[in-house]
Amino acid sequence: MNNRKEDMEITSHYRHLLRELNEQRQHGVLCDACVVVEGKVFKAHKNVLLGSSRYFKTLYCQVQKTSDQATVTHLDIVTAQGFKAIIDFMYSAHLALTSRNVIEVMSAASFLQMTDIVQACHDFIKAALDISIKSDASDELSEFEIGTPASNSTEALISAVMAGRSISPWLARRTSPANSSGDSAIASCHEGGSSYGKEDQEPKADGPDDVSSQSLWPGDVGYGSLRIKEEQISPSHYGGSELPSSKDTAIQNSLSEQGSGDGWQPTGRRKNRKNKETVRHITQQVEEDSQAGSPVPSFLPTSGWPFSSRDSNVDLTVTEASSLDSRGERAELYAHIDEGLLGGETSYLGPPLTPEKEEALHQATAVANLRAALMSKNSLLSLKADVLGDDGSLLFEYLPKGAHSLSLNEFTVIRKKFKCPYCSFSAMHQCILKRHMRSHTGERPYPCEICGKKFTRREHMKRHTLVHSKDKKYVCKVCSRVFMSAASVGIKHGSRRHGVCADCAGRGVGTPLDHGGGGEGSPEALFAGEGPYLEDPDDPRGEAEEELVEDEDEDVAKWKDDVGLAHEDALLGDDKDDEDSPQGPHSPSGEPDKDFAWIS
């Protein structure tokens, strides 16, 4: 008993701790942070904010502690109603969502990088959309089953599905097939209360008549039971030719026979048609999931698919292309593969294949189809290596080796190299990522020296400084001194060149002023990039600025070559300037004229 140890967890302590912290927040006890949203002040504790939001964690951890006073944070992006629901969730673990505030709460949680709340709002919206889609789709399907002729079966189904999809604005925002399970409302429509759900599906028949009827469908003949997601590539890319009219007639007859029979049961496939000329993912469906009479979609013409031959004597050989082959050689290679799969001039209806050959045909067809999509002329994945940068060599490394089955994780092309550690943002250049990080930290590293206004980008600060120096932009091209009057740089005097001050025009090209380039009012000192204006080596705009400086240096050198003043003329010019100057001949030549003020 003396050596007994036990680690006990008391769950009631969590609720008690949150309750006490919430009471302290409501009474303003030990609150060391104030969040101002739309003029409303929300008192809170930094520890709670930091532990609940990655945005506050990044903001408060990088700010050095200067005093014990309360920290005031202004949030201009979120709304007061949305932030109130979020801060109540931080102190109580209860999220109050309604149909009125769910959008505001979701946007505020996304800005504060609280993924749990974003997912909860997403599920709330999805549940509301599923209810409306199911009700509308059920009405459409009931009308379709009762009073629609058999010849219009495909159009009626597509109109019913599109009617349900048009209700949901969130379904169009899906960008990744890996996340498609989050809001597959159309798939849930087939699985829910519809009349042709999975519980009503009939088992596949094993008779020879059923086999011959299945061979009429291009989705099951030669092409295999492949589920294609986001396919919008034209069938002409595969090099297939149109079938004879007699074969089209046979297909139409089979469609009418299937429509007038027991009816077909769709598999609940969902096609996200975003990019019309890319084939992103091709996955092989399990053989048992295919239906005996699945209809041909209206946007996939039966005459365009070349993988419709079921010749048992076809030789299936897939040659692995080298990564160093040219694009033309790859296209030629895949064209030969397609010709081998077509098997010459075989009939559309042929004898059934053995299970081994049929499986090999399905796998080889999937590989050839994917590669043909990659090498299509309009495919986004067929870009050259110079567009993709260092990731160009990764383009064909994700192709399946041999005749293996495909999956979503085997085919991915990474285009952006620099990723934000706090959110899902990614960029091609490091300077863009550094600029994006300032949105998380709130840092404004470029202040104006005159008024103190701070900016997140250096070019914005430079543009702002022109407001203070509108009438003070007369700069000598030789000594780079800045003058307030245009007359002081020789604009109104015909004896001097444009943009050259009186001292430099009288001095010639002998020796420029020592204090000219480093003066306080010179543009080099104003925009030299010293102190807080350090140049970003990764900024692509630096090259353009260097070209402007080089052009200016060429203008100065050209002016120096054209002047050609002799040493005696330079001395006479100095004496004349000394006599005209109100300071007298004994005044030092390095001091500026009193008539013109310097810009500090």
UniProtKB/Swiss-Prot annotation:
GO biological process, one term: plasmacytoid dendritic cell differentiation
Mapped zinc finger ranges (C2H2-type): 418-436, 446-468
One Pfam family cited in the UniProt record for this chain: BTB
Main localization category: nucleus
One GO term describing the cellular component: nucleus
Modified residues (Phosphoserine): S234
Biased composition (Basic and acidic residues): 197-207, 556-574, 591-600
Domain of life of the native organism: Eukaryota
Biased composition (Polar residues): 243-259
Cross-link for Glycyl lysine isopeptide (Lys-Gly) (interchain with G-Cter in SUMO2), residue positions: K229
Modified how: Sumoylated. Desumoylation by DESI1 reverses transcriptional repression activity.
UniProt keyword list: Isopeptide bond, Metal-binding, Nucleus, Phosphoprotein, Repeat, Transcription, Transcription regulation, Ubl conjugation, Zinc, Zinc-finger
Bias-annotated ranges (Acidic residues): 533-555
Region annotated Disordered, chain positions: 173-222, 235-278, 513-600
A GO MF label: transcription cis-regulatory region binding
Aminoacyl-tRNA synthetase as UniProt keyword: no
Domain BTB: 31-99
Function description: Functions as a transcriptional repressor for PRDM1.
Name listed for the protein in its UniProt record: Zinc finger and BTB domain-containing protein 46
Species name: Mus musculus (Mouse)
Encoding gene per record: Zbtb46
